[in-house]
Curated annotation (Swiss-Prot):
Name of the molecule in the record: tRNA (guanine-N(7)-)-methyltransferase
Xref: InterPro entries: SAM-dependent_MTases_sf, tRNA_(Gua-N-7)_MeTrfase_Trmb, tRNA_methyltr_TrmB_bact
Known role: Catalyzes the formation of N(7)-methylguanine at position 46 (m7G46) in tRNA.
Pathway(s) annotated for this protein in UniProt: tRNA modification; N(7)-methylguanine-tRNA biosynthesis
Region listing for Disordered, in residue ranges: 1-24
Keyword annotations from UniProtKB, A to Z: Methyltransferase, S-adenosyl-L-methionine, Transferase, tRNA processing
CDD domains: AdoMet_MTases
Length: 249
């Protein structure tokens, strides 16, 4: 059975920590968004899914604590996903983990429509979408200790060195996420860009509320599928790195 990474009960090892300090010219939280503006056309199928399922599965952004039990209609572990692209991995994970609820942030309408289409096709009930910047959602809708897990899969790597400061996984955001995790909750990042993987490992290792669940990079958890894009990269010899940390008490 697919499940969230097991808590082994022992103190996880920590990867070597860097200084964890953001560049001097980076201002938080306003300078870092959870998304990059992209052009994209909403297809007919996506538009139909938005019309058919949007009112049921897309939540309004409202500053103030989210009532997750009311939003999902039950009390269950809550996982935040920051940026889900076209929703391929999101729908798979929600399907193999029906016991968990997934609050998914994505601003791009084609992606929202694509995930809604998958929700309808698969009869998923444990996903809710916020078409809003995840940083503002974290700041204004998610109280401390409200999350059981966080997924950040393949965020924009900002390849050029002068753009590295725009990367999402930076110390201030990680500190916010760590405080919003319950003790034992997890933060799972994945990237196919090794320099970003190294930065992720350094930043997460420097956060005192988090401890590495592995000795460095983690094995790919069974719940995270290989996407078509990822499979293509692997065929071309590209690597993929998973980083999995847990909130300490």
């Amino acid at each position: 059975m697919h499940s969230i990474p097991a808590d082994t009960g022992h103190t996880p090892s920590r990867a070597p920590a860097g200084n964890g300090s953001p560049p001097a010219d980076v201002a938080f939280p306003k300078a870092i968004k959870s998304y990059v503006r992209r052009a994209g056309r909403t297809t007919t199928g996506q538009a139909k899914a938005l019309e058919t399922f949007g009112s049921q599965f897309v939540l309004d952004y409202t500053p103030g604590p989210l009532d997750a039990q009311a939003a999902f209609g039950r009390a269950a572990p809550l996982i935040l996903e920051i940026g889900f692209g076209m929703g391929e991995a999101t729908a798979h994970i929600a399907g193999v983990r029906p016991q968990d609820d997934f609050l998914c942030c994505e601003v791009h309408e084609p992606g929202v429509g694509a995930l809604l289409k998958r929700i309808g096709e698969r009869g998923l009930t444990n996903i809710r979408i916020l078409q809003h910047d995840a940083v503002e959602v974290i700041d204004h809708m998610l109280p401390e200790g409200s999350l059981d897990g966080v997924h950040i899969f393949f965020p924009d790597p900002w390849h050029k060195k002068r753009h590295n400061k725009r990367r999402l996984v930076q110390p201030p955001l990680v500190a916010k996420l760590a405080r919003r995790l319950k003790p034992g909750g997890y933060l799972h990042c994945a990237t196919d860009w090794q320099p970003y993987a190294e930065q992720m490992l350094e930043v997460l290792s420097a956060e005192p509320l988090l401890a590495n669940s592995a000795d460095g990079y983690a094995p790919q958890p069974d719940y995270r599928p290989l996407t078509k894009f990822e499979n293509r990269g692997l065929r071309l010899g590209h690597g993929v790195w998973d980083i999995l940390f847990r909130r300490v008490a």
